[in-house]
Amino acid sequence: MAKVVICGASGRMGQTLGRMVAESQDLELAGGIDLHPGSFFGAEIVAAKEIEALLASKKPDVLIDFTVAHAAVENVKSAARNNVALIVGTTGFTPEQREVMATAINGHVPAVISSNYSVGVNIFWQLVREAGRLLKDYDIEVIEAHHRNKKDAPSGTAKTILQILDEEAGERRKLYGREGMMERQNEIGVHVIRGGDIVGDHTVMFSKNFETIELSHRAYDRSVFASGALRAARWVVGKKPGIYGMNDVLGLEKT
């Protein structure tokens, strides 16, 4: 039975993950990390400054991180120092932060890093890749919507979409929203919506004269992300050190 520690335990994803781990038959909830201590589905949440002590005492097999970028970098370094495998679902990293994490991980521990752990989203990315390859001469727009409390924009999932489109349809200027008089150039329009309790909506629109193709994914509950993250957690334990993606977990082509 794999022992799991969850960073960001008091957050929306942390609570969903904690409940699902506690209810599972093959995972054990070893504890949580957050800003303030508290109870956590039969385990305990300890303050972030106590992460090293928790990892040393509980000796978990895997640490799952859904926090914010600067905290996640430190959590990754702590896990690597304690030989704990990683699932990183935090988004909004700078290139420099990604480099710091890669240095900590490579040669030390296995880690799955993904901007979205939903199985459906990973299939959606594959469809976007194929459409981008075949529809290079179409106008492309990306629209994403999330709840009012999501801080990073565009979302990590949308950034992955843009990366895929650059690879398959050719690099284009990214135009974030539109205002005023302008002619369309070699660009991808990117539109961000924040409001209410929207879990996560993503649409890629390919348009040409007389037709439009839309690819969309809509999440209705955070459990789809948590389920994928736990699938990755089960998979990553015992793997060779290095950075993996959900494509590796699911046996898909690179996304």
Curated annotation (Swiss-Prot):
One of its GO terms (molecular function) is NAD binding. (S)-2,3,4,5-tetrahydrodipicolinate binds at H147, G156, T157. NAD(+) binds at G8, A9, S10, G11, R12, M13, G89, T90, T91, S114, S115, N116, Y117. CDD domains: DHDPR_N. The keyword NADP applies. Pathway: Amino-acid biosynthesis; L-lysine biosynthesis via DAP pathway; (S)-tetrahydrodipicolinate from L-aspartate: step 4/4. The keyword Oxidoreductase applies. The active site is at H146, K150. Its EC number is 1.17.1.8. It catalyses: (S)-2,3,4,5-tetrahydrodipicolinate + NAD(+) + H2O = (2S,4S)-4-hydroxy-2,3,4,5-tetrahydrodipicolinate + NADH + H(+); (S)-2,3,4,5-tetrahydrodipicolinate + NADP(+) + H2O = (2S,4S)-4-hydroxy-2,3,4,5-tetrahydrodipicolinate + NADPH + H(+). Keywords: Amino-acid biosynthesis, Cytoplasm, Diaminopimelate biosynthesis, Lysine biosynthesis, NAD, NADP, Oxidoreductase. It is found in: Cytoplasm. Gene3D superfamilies: Dihydrodipicolinate Reductase, domain 2, NAD(P)-binding Rossmann-like Domain. InterPro entries: DapB_C, DapB_N, DapB_N_CS, DHDPR_bac, NAD(P)-bd_dom_sf. Belongs to the DapB family. Catalyzes the conversion of 4-hydroxy-tetrahydrodipicolinate (HTPA) to tetrahydrodipicolinate. This is 4-hydroxy-tetrahydrodipicolinate reductase. It comes from Methanoregula boonei (strain DSM 21154 / JCM 14090 / 6A8). The gene is dapB.
